[in-house]
Amino acid sequence: DPELTTAQSKYVESLARAGASVRWVELADPDKAVAVALECAGLLLPGGGDIEPSLFGQERIPSCGEPNPLRDTAEPKLLHAFLAADKPILGICRGIQVLNAFLGGELYQDIKPLEHVPHNDHWAKIHTVTVRRGTLLAEILKQDTVLVNSQHHQAASRVAPGLEIAALSEDGFIEALEKPDAKFCLGVQWHPEWLSEADPRQQALFDAFVNACH
């Protein structure tokens, strides 16, 4: 096991409360990563840096962060492998962007000029999202609005075919996407792992993911 950062340990703790153990997958060899990951019951796509814009059909703008070629190469393979195997997928922050970008959607490379509520550098709860009724997310959270933290400067723009919007921020940015025809495929733009210890509604996301893995 790698020596975990505080951010990584939050995922482990949230999943452990739901009754799951975590296996970290080395991405240096993407095909090997897929083979190893498919031994697991589900895939969590965690937060991280920006995605290379050319991978979703755009030219990089100056405010786009440095991409992570390792993750940009391996994560789409992992995503498609788990969808093909009909295994549960939970995407968090960068993870929701991976879902959208690599299933044929597009991203805002920088939402800063467009935002009306704070979206970056807030690990504590900072803004409200509205959950769409009838979605998997609504079934999990069991409420129409939820107060979330926010730690991103990119967001889904054009939604990928097959994905549906499950939640929006107060200023209209996509905060959750899901794939209704999958066993369990849900992405959220916030970081529930930083809130789940104190907030049962945020822990419910991990509980539902782990339940789907059984």
Specify the residue positions occupied by each region the protein language model found.
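N-terminal beta1-alpha1 cap of cysteine-dependent amidohydrolase-like domains
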Residues: 1-92, 101-102, 112-141, 145-147, ...
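Post-Walker A helix-loop "phosphate-sensing" segment adjacent to the P-loop in P-loop NTPases
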Residues: 104-108
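Active-site-proximal beta-strand elements of phosphoester/diester hydrolases
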Residues: 186-189
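Active-site helix of classical SDR
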Residues: 95
